[in-house]
Amino acid sequence: MLHVALCRTGATLKLSFMIEPLLIAELALLGLTTGFLAGLLGVGGGMVMVPFVTLIMSSRGASSGLAVKMAIATSMATIMFTSISSVRAHHQRGAVRWDIAKRFAPGIVLGSFIGSLGVFALLKGTYLAIFFALFVGFSATQMIRDKKPAAARQLPGNAGLFGFGALIGFLSGLVGAGGAFISVPFMTWCNVHMRNAVATSAALGFPIAVANVIGYVITGRHVMDLPAGSFGYIWLPALGIIALCSVLTAPLGARATHALPVAVLKKVFASILYVLATYMLYRGLAG
């Protein structure tokens, strides 16, 4: 049985989660799953990690609002590790389009800072969540339809990629995901091969994660009711266990990417996008 203890440090009331075998097993299984998804689809597993970490924390005494914020921040922090592991595997196969990643990166960093340093702390995100769900659902539908992009359609110039990168970083920071839910459909729409889009998206996950984590630490440093073992909004025990397990399975997912047919990969990714869209729509409508 898992226990929740309350620890008082000065005027601060902290939740102390005892790390017992069941909790370790829960977090380890979550890490193995999200790591495989990171390698397979270029995602950091945020759509899986955020709801489950929220459930784990809220069931142990954390308020719903705090649990969601810490789940988002902890999810994003693990992406720093899963992205490195999966990108290495993709790079060894020559799948990462570094020329595209370098053009995306400046906008991604700016958008991530705007989201994590400002909007994350202030915005409930009801209307944004609904818009986001509709956008992701549309992207998933386009992938399932497999409508061929115009032969002449190409990626936009540096200004266009900067702006779209800022949008990716901004939205990623609000949901704790690595950005593949937007960047992969966008790149395939612009005639980037699916496997290259997945690999490049995995590379983009690292700057997204680093910039957002900095913001989460800064904005969370003065919050008074964080659980013991927190660094800003990041729950370090969960980060350590999930990250350790996820780096083990990320290379397996990356190898599966290069073994699966592109059509199957698109359907798998679209299915995950629908799950994320449904969850975000629920969060938006529930207020």
PLM-predicted stretches and their roles:
Residues A73-A77, A203-F206:
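Alpha-helical transmembrane segments of polytopic membrane transporters and translocases
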